[in-house]
Amino acid sequence: MAVNQSHTENRRGVLIPNGESLLKQSLNVELSFPRQSEGSNVFNGTKTGTLFLTSYRVIFITSHSINGPMLSFMMPFDLITNLTVEQPVFAANFIKGTIQAAPYGGWEGQATFKLVFRNGGAIEFAQLMVKAASSVIAYGAPPAGYGAPPAGYGAPPPGYGAPPAGYGAPPPGYGAPPAGYGAQPAGNEGPPVGYRASPAGYGAPPLGYEAPPAGNEGLPAGYRASPAGSGARPHESAAAQAPENEASLPSASSS
């Protein structure tokens, strides 16, 4: 059992250790100690407050309007013995038992406690308490508390939220690039504006094909390509001309 270690600063809340869950909360409960250890005045008198039941312990928080040396009182199940539920005829039901002091709990020895439920619910609270204590015996003590994350792990920058609905992992097969594949060298940029990919069926040029020499450019303005299936005739222009505008070909020079 520990004294004044389980309440918030203004006593309007309870401090529950990591790994535990809140099972029940009862208001208007009176706590007293018919038998207490000598040499401590924190157990004197009757305290009124709220009783909390977690998966590993019982915590009592005195009302914030009450001034006294005891602000909170915590009792782990493994330090409680002789637990009973009393049902007086002309008084409210109460839970009674013996509690041992916990190491570094703020007091030493043992004491007998009494919890009176002015709003009812003592039997239900005791049943849940026994069930939770049985689980502790079966599964062991609570796990170690979760501490702060290691240095360097902070909150994500603004704008980084959860992915939209339907967004999942990439399809299988998308992994690292094969060995030898690296980034493009400096100067390799994207295609110019207006560039379109070649239509389907255009593949790599045949072996032995070389690029045309420098200076070979496209046809001058006004020239159009020959219709499909028409090959170029030797020593004739590929451009169509009217009969009256045909150019005379120069005579071949004699060798």
UniProtKB/Swiss-Prot annotation:
Organism (species): Macaca fascicularis (Crab-eating macaque)
Claim: Repeat is one of the keywords in the record: yes
Annotated region described as 6 X 7 AA tandem repeat of Y-G-X-P-P-X-G, given as residue ranges: 139-208
Region (Disordered): 180-199, 204-255
Listed GO CC annotations: nucleus
Per-repeat ranges for Sequence: 139-145, 146-152, 153-159, 160-166, 167-173, 174-180, 202-208
Pfam families, A to Z: GRAM (PF02893)
Gene: WBP2NL
Gene3D superfamilies documented for this protein: Pleckstrin-homology domain (PH domain)/Phosphotyrosine-binding domain (PTB)
Motif PPxY motif mapped to chain: 171-174
Residue ranges occupied by any GRAM domain in the UniProt entry: 15-87
PANTHER family: POSTACROSOMAL SHEATH WW DOMAIN-BINDING PROTEIN, WW DOMAIN BINDING PROTEIN 2, ISOFORM E
Key word Amino-acid biosynthesis present: no
Signal peptide region: none
Gene Ontology molecular function: any one: chromatin DNA binding
InterPro entries: GRAM (IPR004182), PH-like_dom_sf (IPR011993), WBP2-like (IPR044852)
Domain of life: Eukaryota
Function recorded in the entry: May play a role in meiotic resumption and pronuclear formation, mediated by a WW domain-signaling pathway during fertilization.
Keywords, alphabetical: Repeat
The name this protein goes by in its record: Postacrosomal sheath WW domain-binding protein
